[in-house]
Amino acid sequence: MNMTSLSAICTGAVTILLAGMASAGPVGDQYRAGAFGLPWNAGKSAIQAKYPGGTWDKDDKDRDRYCAPSRQSLLKLPPQHQTRELCFLIGADGTMASVTARMDASLPSLLAVVNRSRTVFGDFDAVRRDEAAIQSRSTAMLWTRDKPYVVQVSSSNDADGSPQEVNFTVADEAALYAEGLAQVSNKPKAP
């Protein structure tokens, strides 16, 4: 093999390696194969077999959803911040499209999951708020850089500002969570 061929092979290998690294990100790295012990191509029966004792219903967009009680660790948080319930949303292709871990509704749980998500995935890059209210009653922080894989941490509060709901969602269909998003930047603006 001559030097030109060897050089071309090395250049091609480095290009492929760098292209793969450029498309990888913390959300994709963690959830590319699936979430909560199931692959993204899991169907209804596989979900129900892994998490028995749940119930099927429809979400607000008429998509099939399966919710089952499940106490397990989330993002290696301490035991007091375990999941309470997992809800699996079925996509248009009949497979798992997203999983929402419902947490105990408390400010410590919300802060723990937000802070750990920022540590693991970096700063969130999109947000959704209840803009109709004077004081926002719901907020969602999203990590969307690794589309189609998306992580969302959401909460809803009562009139006094106490959390009523704390959720951690991971999806492989970014379009499910794209509605009403406002992109945010954590970079300081030039004066």
PLM segments and residue spans:
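Short, compositionally biased strand/turn segments
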Residues: 3, 23-28, 93-97
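Non-cytosolic coordination micro-motifs
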Residues: 25-68, 100-191
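N-terminal signal peptide c-region/cleavage motif recognized by signal peptidases
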Residues: 19-21
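Mid-chain, structured segments of secreted extracytoplasmic proteins
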Residues: 66-113
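Bacterial N-terminal signal peptides that target proteins for export
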Residues: 1-11
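Core hydrophobic alpha-helical transmembrane segments of single-pass membrane proteins
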Residues: 13-16
